[in-house]
């Protein structure tokens, strides 16, 4: 049987393959279809999403090249689209890697040497996925396209590439660059582009790239972003992710058909001291009742209602003041000679401005950066992102901040709204590889005791215990938005511990895994 290999993958005549497989044809297509799991509170009128690891183009059905072994029994005769790749300049440049990074570089390099090589790297947040990928770029010496989800991550890639591989011509590909001229791999050795822009490019744009790096690869499951896979099949592909199979709806499984099963590395031994301050908050009755849609609790609408409580907003401000006061008044006590940085996470963009206004009234002389707010106006500025690296307080949504944004001076988190998913990535914002291990990490977690979302705290407890962070409980209410003294409810070294304390705990050492 004849087949073609092109940008879109392995193309086989639809009718001939159907005739060859007969009743197994339907089974094959079913096996290559991922159906989303229904989420709690999801309205019934919203259709259950499906995505397929095949696509139809005219008389042909295309499959990911990774699946070509499944067709070996048919003695396939392939006609491949010709690809001519130039070699990047070979300059001996060395930069340090940890042992676990070097081991993974060797493993990835071996896999990507072969044409159409694929590798899906699973490495926890803050452990240097970018540096591993840059080492692969240096070894393969192919023109490379790096695809990232946000401008903030794009800037980080540009900075890291320029620092580690200064001899290469590196460029950022975005809407502004598109208007000036059409960048190609002939002009640049490495192009770093944002998915929202690159997914609109024709197949021919991707032809000159011998290597494509997909940062935050698990996020390419969305209907629009997923289309990129049917344009890059001729390249070697390296996918990077801290949470490759972590979506509640399971749609990130579709990525496996293109990249293979995620491969983990040996855990490093970086340690961080830290603890959790859990505040049990009793909100005003007007704001804690659940919001139901189609007789099911809607988490989004319920969170929106919770944050209409002015006392709850004041509680977050008070906690920020408390952290800032501790860090600035007694930095030596907390293991540092300079103030900490504080990240405040919220669920929705519209809450960023609400908290910004509330914080600005209390922190008149403190730099507060909201790098995401500018996105509402068409794009975050380079200036705002640059300022964020020295800001004392940063406001982010969970969706934006959980991606690989690196602020190494940030060591405290306030979770201003409830959260269940992506907790590994959220905590990773304050446990970046290369940041100061001596600084104590602090997580402020607000549990809305009268809300149906309060049970989500137990999912967070599971992650805290995995990290080895003791949990200290205190209370507050809409009548008294100042948290009480702390009570130790869990200690990684003493499960039965229930000791009272009003001073910062002796933090545990967390192995960064």
Curated annotation (Swiss-Prot):
Helicase ATP-binding domain residues: 110-262
Binding-site positions, ATP: 123-130
Keyword Transport on entry: no
Catalytically driven reaction(s): ATP + H2O = ADP + phosphate + H(+)
Similarity section: Belongs to the DEAD box helicase family. DEAH subfamily.
Placement of sequence motif DEAH box: 215-218
Presence of keyword Repeat: no
Gene3D superfamilies reported in the protein's UniProt record: P-loop containing nucleotide triphosphate hydrolases
GO molecular function, a single term: ATP hydrolysis activity
Disulfide feature: none
SUPFAM superfamilies the record matches: P-loop containing nucleoside triphosphate hydrolases
Protein name: Putative ATP-dependent RNA helicase QP509L
């Amino acid at each position: 049987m004849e087949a073609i290999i092109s940008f879109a993958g392995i193309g086989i005549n639809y009718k001939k393959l159907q005739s060859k497989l007969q009743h197994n044809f339907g089974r094959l297509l079913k096996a290559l279809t991922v159906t989303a799991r229904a989420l709690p509170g999801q309205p019934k009128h919203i259709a259950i999403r499906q995505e397929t690891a095949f696509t139809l183009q005219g008389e042909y059905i295309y499959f990911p090249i990774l699946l070509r072994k499944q067709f070996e029994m048919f003695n396939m005769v392939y006609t491949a689209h010709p690809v001519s790749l130039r070699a990047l300049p070979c300059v001996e440049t060395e930069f340090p890697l940890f042992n676990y990074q070097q081991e993974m570089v060797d493993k990835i390099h071996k896999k990507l040497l072969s044409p159409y090589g694929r590798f899906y790297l699973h490495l926890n947040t803050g452990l240097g996925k970018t540096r591993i990928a840059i080492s692969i770029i240096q070894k393969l010496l192919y023109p490379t396209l790096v695809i990232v989800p946000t401008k903030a991550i794009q800037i980080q890639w540009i900075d890291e590439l320029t620092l580690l591989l200064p001899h290469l011509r590196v460029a950022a590909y975005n809407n502004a660059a598109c208007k000036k001229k059409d960048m190609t791999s002939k002009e640049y050795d490495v192009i770093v582009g944002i998915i929202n822009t690159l997914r609109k490019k024709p197949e021919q744009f991707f032809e000159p790239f011998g290597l494509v790096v997909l940062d935050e690869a698990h996020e390419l499951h969305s209907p629009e972003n997923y289309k990129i896979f049917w344009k890059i099949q001729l390249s070697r592909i390296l996918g990077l992710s801290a949470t490759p199979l972590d979506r509640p709806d399971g749609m990130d499984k579709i990525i496996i058909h293109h990249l293979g099963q995620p491969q983990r590395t040996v855990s490093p031994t970086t340690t961080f001291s830290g603890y959790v301050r859990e505040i049990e908050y009793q909100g005003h009755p007007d704001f804690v009742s659940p919001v139901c849609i189609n007789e099911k609790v809607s988490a989004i609408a319920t969170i929106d209602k919770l944050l209409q409580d002015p006392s709850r907003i004041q509680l977050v401000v008070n906690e920020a003041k408390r952290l800032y006061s501790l860090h600035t008044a007694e930095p030596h006590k907390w293991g540092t000679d300079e103030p900490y940085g504080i990240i405040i996470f919220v669920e929705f963009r519209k809450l960023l401005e609400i908290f910004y206004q509330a914080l600005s009234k209390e922190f008149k002389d403190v730099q507060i950066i909201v790098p995401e707010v500018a996105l509402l106006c068409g794009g975050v500025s380079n200036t705002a992102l640059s300022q964020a690296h020295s800001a004392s307080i940063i406001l982010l949504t969970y969706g934006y901040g959980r991606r690989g944004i690196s602020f190494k001076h940030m060591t405290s988190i306030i979770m201003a709204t409830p959260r269940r998913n992506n907790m590994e990535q959220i905590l990773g914002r304050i446990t970046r590889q290369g940041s100061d291990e001596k600084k104590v990490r602090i997580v402020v977690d607000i549990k809305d005791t009268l809300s149906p979302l309060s049970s989500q705290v137990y999912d967070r407890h599971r992650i805290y215990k995995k990290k080895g962070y003791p949990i200290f409980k205190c209370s507050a209410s809409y009548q008294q938005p100042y948290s009480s003294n702390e009570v130790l409810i869990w200690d990684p070294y003493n499960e039965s511990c229930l000791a009272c304390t009003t001073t910062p705990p002796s933090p545990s050492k967390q192995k960064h895994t």
